[in-house]
């Protein structure tokens, strides 16, 4: 069974591992750098940019896969799924138009407005800097609301800036908004939204064009440093719980979040056609219930590393059900286990990361700790590993409870030597208690 995988990060390493649990799978991967974890699982690798559509076509024509799985967002944005579907290859990953739920923040917000989907917020989109932006921000200030400045296109999770975190106040938000246009960050178009106050969580679904099957809820940690301090990153780690919920969210609130995602899928279908693939909703649990921060048209990274290792159902079967519109005929199960994922990242990440420095990884010690190792933005050359400037590698601890899973992950994360750092507090009971207390305060 030939499977084409596009992408070379830790998320794709998790996808590759999950696929290879089926002994029939022969994996063929197109990726930019030599990720040693994915390379070891692949029959053949094409080293090309994941947005190089002619290279994707050439590789697919050569290997003739029976199904394709697209990992990152960038190939979705250039129509990789459209190409593969046109070639007659069942594909897991939305086509270019449905993928706008991630690639165009304006499309996402307009969809919520048009179809009156719950969980929306006050926002405005702008094509240039001028009086309109300043007036909108001034209006938000008069309402007592801080703002979030979001480049409208893809920025790898690092273009968003929030007042009270990366920005001092709404006046500084104006300065950053001008910078987005001056530097054409994320395509040189922006969304300015009201800042949501609450606790973040993520919810994933398998989507087959009509049906959505939900996965366990996960909490990501986007801030670079312990205690949720520092700049926003692509995600420093995450955890999930044995009951598939989270300690600070009720079943009712989780159900409301699921209904928001269900209506989103239906609205995408009505607006631009069927959505097939993985859908990731990033939510803020506020005093008014769950609100959507943004959607991703693929697995979250790091969340894929929490979810896929505890998937009991054959992942290849799930992929075919997505591609063929048959999710309603499947009973998809996850183990009732806790997971904790922690990332090592280059010193200086995400602002000014060191690059092309050697990273020593004690793989045996990580295995002995009981953790799973996932390679991310790593390049292997002549038997040595080099960091490339983005997140380097992740470890995942899995156990009956969060406390034990965190201990496994922490023991494992100490087995990297190089110019890297990590957050030691992810999955700890102290940090989780802070989340619970924050939600209690919201309810008052």
Swiss-Prot record:
ATP-grasp domain mapped to chain residues: 109-324
Amino-acid positions noted as binding Mn(2+) 2 in the UniProt annotation, renumbered to this chain: 294, 296
UniProt-listed SUPFAM superfamilies: Glutathione synthetase ATP-binding domain-like, PreATP-grasp domain, Rudiment single hybrid motif
SMART domains attached to this UniProt entry: GARS_A, GARS_C
Cross-referenced InterPro entries: ATP-grasp (IPR011761), ATP_grasp_subdomain_1 (IPR013815), PreATP-grasp_dom_sf (IPR016185), PRibGlycinamid_synth_ATP-grasp (IPR020561), PRibGlycinamide_synth (IPR000115), PRibGlycinamide_synth_C-dom (IPR020560), PRibGlycinamide_synth_C_sf (IPR037123), PRibGlycinamide_synth_CS (IPR020559)
Pfam families per UniProt: GARS_A (PF01071), GARS_C (PF02843), GARS_N (PF02844)
Involved pathway(s): Purine metabolism; IMP biosynthesis via de novo pathway; N(1)-(5-phospho-D-ribosyl)glycinamide from 5-phospho-alpha-D-ribose 1-diphosphate: step 2/2
Extent of the signal sequence: none
E.C. designation(s): 6.3.4.13
Residues binding Mn(2+) 1: 282, 294
Binding positions (ATP): 140-202
Gene3D superfamilies hit by this protein: 3.40.50.20, ATP-grasp fold, A domain (3.30.1490.20), ATP-grasp fold, B domain (3.30.470.20), Phosphoribosylglycinamide synthetase, C-terminal domain (3.90.600.10)
Cofactor(s) demanded: Mg(2+); Mn(2+)
Positions contributing to Mg(2+) 1 binding: 282, 294
Entry's cofactor comment: Binds 2 magnesium or manganese ions per subunit.
Keywords: ATP-binding, Ligase, Magnesium, Manganese, Metal-binding, Nucleotide-binding, Purine biosynthesis
One GO-annotated biological process of the protein: 'de novo' IMP biosynthetic process
A GO MF term: ATP binding
Reactions accelerated catalytically: 5-phospho-beta-D-ribosylamine + glycine + ATP = N(1)-(5-phospho-beta-D-ribosyl)glycinamide + ADP + phosphate + H(+)
Binding site for Mg(2+) 2: 294, 296
Listed HAMAP family: GARS
Family to which the UniProt record says this protein belongs: Belongs to the GARS family.
Protein name: Phosphoribosylamine--glycine ligase
Originating organism: Methanococcus maripaludis (strain C7 / ATCC BAA-1331)
């Amino acid at each position: 069974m030939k499977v084409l995988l596009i992408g070379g990060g830790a998320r794709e390493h998790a996808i590759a591992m999950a696929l290879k649990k089926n002994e029939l799978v022969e994996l063929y991967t197109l990726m930019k750098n030599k990720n040693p974890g994915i390379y070891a699982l692949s029959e053949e690798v094409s080293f090309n940019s994941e947005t190089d559509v002619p290279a994707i076509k050439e590789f697919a024509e050569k290997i003739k896969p029976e199904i394709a799985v697209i990992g990152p967002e960038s190939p979705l944005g250039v129509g990789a799924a459209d190409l593969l579907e046109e070639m007659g290859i069942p594909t897991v990953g939305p086509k270019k138009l449905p993928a706008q739920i991630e690639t165009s923040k304006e499309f996402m917000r307009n969809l919520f407005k048009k179809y009156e989907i719950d969980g929306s917020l006050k926002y405005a989109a702008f094509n240039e800097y001028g009086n309109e932006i300043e007036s909108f921000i001034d209006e938000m200030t008069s309402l007592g609301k801080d703002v979030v400045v979001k480049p409208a296109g893809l920025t790898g999770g690092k273009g968003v800036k929030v007042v009270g975190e990366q920005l001092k106040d709404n006046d500084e938000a104006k300065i950053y908004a001008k910078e987005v246009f001056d530097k054409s960050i994320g395509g040189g178009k922006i969304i300015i939204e009201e800042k949501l106050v609450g606790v973040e969580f993520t919810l994933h679904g398998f989507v087959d064009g009509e049906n959505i099957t939900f996965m366990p809820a996960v909490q990501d940690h986007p801030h670079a440093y312990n205690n949720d301090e520092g700049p926003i990153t692509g995600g420093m780690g995450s955890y999930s719980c044995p009951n598939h919920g989270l300690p600070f969210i009720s079943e009712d609130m989780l159900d409301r979040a699921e209904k928001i995602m269900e209506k989103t899928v239906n609205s995408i279908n009505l607006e631009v056609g069927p959505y097939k693939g993985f859908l990731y909703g990033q939510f803020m649990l506020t005093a008014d219930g769950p609100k959507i921060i943004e959607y991703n048209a693929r697995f979250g990274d790091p969340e894929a590393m929490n979810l896929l290792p505890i998937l009991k159902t054959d992942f290849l079967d799930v992929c075919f059900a997505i591609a063929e519109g048959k999710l309603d005929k499947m009973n998809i199960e996850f183990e009732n286990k806790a997971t904790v994922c922690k990332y090592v990242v280059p010193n200086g990440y995400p602002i000014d990361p060191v690059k092309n420095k050697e990273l020593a990884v004690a793989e045996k010690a990580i295995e002995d700790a009981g953790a799973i190792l996932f390679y991310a933005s790593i390049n292997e050359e002549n038997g040595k590993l080099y960091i490339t400037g983005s997140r380097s590698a992740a470890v995942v601890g899995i156990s009956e409870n969060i406390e034990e899973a965190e201990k496994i992950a922490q023991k494992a994360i100490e087995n990297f030597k190089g110019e890297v750092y990590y957050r030691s507090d992810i999955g700890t009971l102290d940090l989780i208690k802070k989340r619970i207390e924050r939600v209690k305060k919201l309810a008052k």
